[in-house]
Amino acid sequence: GVNRRGNIFKLITALKQICNHPYQFLKSGETSKELSGKAEKCVSLVQSILDNNEKTLIFTQYKEMGDLLTKILCEECGSEPSFFHGSLTVPQREHLIEDFQNNDDRKVMILSLKAGGTGLNLTSATNVIHYDLWWNPAVEEQATDRTYRIGQDKNVMVHRLITLGTFEEKIDEMLKAKKELADLAVYEGEK
């Protein structure tokens, strides 16, 4: 019953953390990007985005992963990204948004998916990276929509990082089916 579901959820969470970076699961050890294909891909994407003098938002559902990405990107790219998360005060959040939107030197903002999901206008970003998958595709879309506000005049590239050969591929298939069903329900309801 409930106990079994709790154990399954813990297992899934552990597997997701391992896909993100082994350090997130182990809570100790090396934090090198080389230990995670996903971290390596994220760094490569961010470096390419920076080379094009563009800005990016990186969404993760885990604050610990945001902390780790901040460390890795600082080491690999030479500048510290902003990190917008639920523990920040309202003035701190407002400052981060203002700085990201108006400071040409501030190119990367990491956001915890829940904290960065509603009411934000981050149209200076031309790239969105979803580092890990959320169970509800609408939450992911809402996060992406931060860049599609009034005033956005550029194309926005959305990158979803999924570790090949893992259960993340199955989660992605499930999410796509769930989204198709939701889209169909909306379409049918509009008739």
What are these model-derived regions, one by one?
Residues G1-L120, E190-K191:
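Conserved Helicase C-terminal RecA-like lobe
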Residues E80, Q92, K107-E190:
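SF2 helicase/translocase ATPase core recognition
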